[in-house]
Amino acid sequence: MAKEELIEMSGMVVEVLPDSRFRVTLDNGHNLVAYSAGKMRKHHIRILCGDKVSLELSPYDLSKGRITFRHLEGRGPLGPQRRRR
């Protein structure tokens, strides 16, 4: 049996919730609760309020999603860069 197609959307994080979940407002105005993907947790990618993110939604439950990518546009500098030896 083939896996169902996931719906790709983009939105903005409006609230950080406990248990690494986030309230996200999609570009079309809908609100949903999303969690960060396992690879994002593995590589310690931090998601903050106001970040633009890409999400995957299941066609069966459109109120929950998985954050798969964080866009860096509009963010300030990340801090001083360390020199490698």
UniProtKB/Swiss-Prot annotation:
Domain of life of the native organism: Bacteria
Subcellular location: Cytoplasm
Signal peptide (UniProt feature, chain positions): none
Primary location group: cytoplasm
Keyword NAD tagged: no
Cysteines paired by S-S bonds: none
Keywords linked to the UniProt accession: Cytoplasm, Initiation factor, Protein biosynthesis, RNA-binding, rRNA-binding
A GO molecular function held by the record: ribosome binding
One Gene Ontology cellular component: cytosol
UniProt domain S1-like: residue ranges: 1-72
SUPFAM superfamilies named among the record's database cross-references: Nucleic acid-binding proteins
Pfam family, any one: eIF-1a
Keyword Cytoplasm included in the entry's annotation: yes
Gene3D superfamilies, alphabetized: Nucleic acid-binding proteins
Family matches, as HAMAP family: IF_1 (MF_00075)
Subunit structure: Component of the 30S ribosomal translation pre-initiation complex which assembles on the 30S ribosome in the order IF-2 and IF-3, IF-1 and N-formylmethionyl-tRNA(fMet); mRNA recruitment can occur at any time during PIC assembly.
Function: One of the essential components for the initiation of protein synthesis. Stabilizes the binding of IF-2 and IF-3 on the 30S subunit to which N-formylmethionyl-tRNA(fMet) subsequently binds. Helps modulate mRNA selection, yielding the 30S pre-initiation complex (PIC). Upon addition of the 50S ribosomal subunit IF-1, IF-2 and IF-3 are released leaving the mature 70S translation initiation complex.
Family statement: Belongs to the IF-1 family.
Name of the protein: Translation initiation factor IF-1 1
Lineage of source species: Bacteria, Pseudomonadati, Pseudomonadota, Betaproteobacteria, Rhodocyclales
